[in-house]
Amino acid sequence: MDIAIHHPWIRRPFFPFHSPSRLFDQFFGEHLLESDLFPTSTSLSPFYLRPPSFLRAPSWIDTGLSEMRLEKDRFSVNLDVKHFSPEELKVKVLGDVIEVHGKHEERQDEHGFISREFHRKYRIPADVDPLTITSSLSSDGVLTVNGPRKQAPGPERTIPITREEKPAVTAAPKK
């Protein structure tokens, strides 16, 4: 069976996801559906996305969601980490990169035993000081990592020139 492979750097002009702000299909450690194991047709999409990612139950839609925003005054990353406790998460700044790591060892759930682990890296914009990056975890399991953007210089202004009557350089007395 032949499966067409489309390279992500080949863009079609009317494809709606030219530069998505969200990473698609991030179901960290979620169990597979039977339909995930069968090949699918790529005739409708130039990129491969698991079809069940948009057909799953509504409660699964935001699982593993990662969203990066660059607003006027701040840079932020929101990451759905509801399957991890705060002790199982680490956020580090390495140079101009934020690294988020989550891991929990094998434990039992309603389907059997499961362990999860993920790594995410985000480049810090040049106008955000890495020393100002903070993170917080909401009660519904969304990790937010953010930092303020440096303020742009004010608008251009013309400085008036005033004329003085005395010279700036005076001659030194002759010896």
From Swiss-Prot:
Q: Name one GO molecular function term.
A: protein-containing complex binding
Question: Where is the protein localized?
Answer: Cytoplasm; Nucleus; Secreted; Lysosome
The region called Disordered is annotated at: 142-175
Q: Which residues carry this modification: Phosphoserine?
A: S19, S45, S59
Name the organs or tissues of expression.
Answer: Lens as well as other tissues.
Query: The sHSP domain covers which part of the protein?
Result: 56-164
SUPFAM superfamilies, alphabetized = HSP20-like chaperones (SSF49764)
Which residues does this entry mark as bearing N6-acetyllysine? K92, K166
Q: In which domain of life is the source organism classified?
A: Eukaryota
Q: Which InterPro entries match?
A: A-crystallin/Hsp20_dom, ACD_alphaB-crystallin, Alpha-crystallin/HSP_16, Alpha-crystallin/sHSP_animal, Alpha-crystallin_N, HSP20-like_chaperone
* Residues binding Zn(2+) 1: H83, H111, H119
Sugar attachment sites are S41, T170
Q: Fetch the Pfam families from UniProt.
A: Crystallin, HSP20
Which residues participate in Zn(2+) 2 binding? H104, E106
> Got a GO cellular component term for this one?
plasma membrane
Record-linked PANTHER family: ALPHA-CRYSTALLIN B CHAIN, HEAT SHOCK PROTEIN HSP-12.2-RELATED
Family statement: Belongs to the small heat shock protein (HSP20) family.
Q: How does it assemble?
A: Heteromer composed of three CRYAA and one CRYAB subunits. Aggregates with homologous proteins, including the small heat shock protein HSPB1, to form large heteromeric complexes. Inter-subunit bridging via zinc ions enhances stability, which is crucial as there is no protein turn over in the lens. Interacts with HSPBAP1 and TTN/titin. Interacts with TMEM109; in the cellular response to DNA damage. Interacts with DES; binds rapidly during early stages of DES filament assembly and a reduced binding seen in the later stages.
Name listed for the protein in its UniProt record = Alpha-crystallin B chain
Specify the species: Oryctolagus cuniculus (Rabbit)
- What is the gene called? CRYAB
